[in-house]
């Protein structure tokens, strides 16, 4: 089963509309250009002036007749009229006349005046004459077609010096300022390297500064978070009494052990009335004293054998044991 094609997107529709409108506009312009073939085929006034002819008359496809200083030759080209020198030599065209003619044509084109056209039967399609300039801008040279039987005339400048008709050979210009270009390139490279080094040093300093700032922030946070100096623990009176009772118990226990050891070594003797209350006649039993009820407040269990010197609050010194009999 064939999958259905998705509908075209609005973007594709817009592109299609633009393409169709462009095709329609191109066809309309082409039709308008085809409706006026005479206007498109008629050369411009500057082209006619370069051909040394008058402007294109209305409805014609070619330029008008030759202008006043020129005459039409056998090939249908407008060539300057030859003037014979007083000595009777070859006729030579004058370059000043051609320059004056071109200046007059340009001025006439700007002013809008045109020469009256001649009938169409005398109009021919001439070959364009080449208008060139010398290599160094010394003068204006007009490339004139040469007839088979007429020698090529040599134009003269206003100063009377002949202008050679040979092709001008231009030597390639030698590059100047090569050392200056190399020096500029070296300076540009040096500035680029210096800028890159300065940028790298600045980035390194910035990274180190940011690292130091982060370390300082971490140290400040740890200092603020750390607890202060440990304060002395507060001991309730009940705990103090419990500690004293434990010490008394430890003392009595040590005393009973010492008495038992002495009785095994020596014969039994009668004890004082004070000691008879604490131990029986055989001495096989240990008397334990109850320290009393614990307080209703905080209660803490301590090891009697633990060194209480580690406590910050000094405990009362135990009473000295009575002398052994």
Swiss-Prot record:
The chain crosses the membrane at residues 182-202. Disulfide bonds: none annotated. The gene is NPDC1. Residues 138-175, 266-290 are annotated as: Disordered. Residues 1-34 form the signal peptide. One of its GO terms (cellular component) is plasma membrane. Strongly expressed in adult brain; especially in hippocampus, frontal lobe and temporal lobe. The keyword Phosphoprotein applies. PANTHER family: NEURAL PROLIFERATION DIFFERENTIATION AND CONTROL PROTEIN 1, NEURAL PROLIFERATION DIFFERENTIATION AND CONTROL PROTEIN-1 NPDC-1 PROTEIN. It is a single-pass membrane protein. The keyword Phosphoprotein applies. Keywords: Membrane, Phosphoprotein, Signal, Transmembrane, Transmembrane helix. Belongs to the NPDC1/cab-1 family. InterPro entries: NPDC1 (IPR009635). This is Neural proliferation differentiation and control protein 1. The modification Phosphoserine is found at residue 229. Residues 275-284 have a biased composition (Acidic residues). Suppresses oncogenic transformation in neural and non-neural cells and down-regulates neural cell proliferation. Might be involved in transcriptional regulation. It is found in: Membrane. It comes from Homo sapiens (Human).
């Amino acid at each position: 089963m064939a999958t259905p094609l998705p509908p075209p997107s609005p973007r594709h529709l817009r592109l299609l509309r633009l393409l169709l409108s462009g095709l329609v506009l191109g066809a309309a312009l082409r039709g308008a250009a085809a409706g006026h073939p005479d206007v498109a085929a008629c050369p411009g006034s500057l082209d006619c002036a370069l051909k040394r002819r008058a402007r294109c008359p209305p409805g014609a496809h070619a330029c008008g007749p030759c202008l006043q200083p020129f005459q039409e030759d056998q090939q249908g080209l407008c060539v300057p009229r030859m003037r014979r020198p007083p000595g009777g030599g070859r006729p030579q065209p004058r370059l000043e006349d051609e320059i004056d003619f071109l200046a007059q044509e340009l001025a006439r084109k700007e002013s809008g005046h045109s020469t009256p056209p001649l009938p169409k039967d005398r109009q021919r399609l001439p070959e364009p004459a080449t208008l060139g300039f010398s290599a160094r801008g010394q003068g204006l040279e007009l490339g004139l077609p040469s007839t088979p039987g007429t020698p090529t005339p040599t134009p003269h400048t206003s100063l009377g010096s002949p202008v050679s008709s040979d092709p001008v050979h231009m030597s390639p210009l030698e590059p100047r300022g090569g050392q200056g270009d190399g020096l500029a390139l070296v300076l540009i490279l040096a500035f680029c390297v210096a800028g890159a080094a300065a940028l790298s040093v600045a980035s390194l300093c910035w990274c180190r500064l940011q690292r130091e700032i982060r370390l300082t922030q971490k140290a400040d946070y740890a200092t603020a978070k750390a607890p202060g100096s440990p304060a002395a623990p507060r001991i309730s009176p009940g705990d103090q009494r419990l500690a004293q009772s434990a010490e008394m118990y430890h003392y009595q226990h040590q005393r009973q052990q010492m008495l038992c050891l002495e009785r095994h070594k020596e014969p039994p003797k009668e004890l004082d009335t004070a000691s008879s209350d604490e131990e029986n006649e055989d001495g096989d039993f240990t008397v334990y004293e109850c320290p009393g009820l614990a307080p209703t407040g905080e209660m803490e269990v301590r090891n009697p054998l633990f060194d209480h010197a580690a406590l910050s609050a000094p405990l009362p010194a135990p009473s000295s044991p009575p002398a052994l009999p």
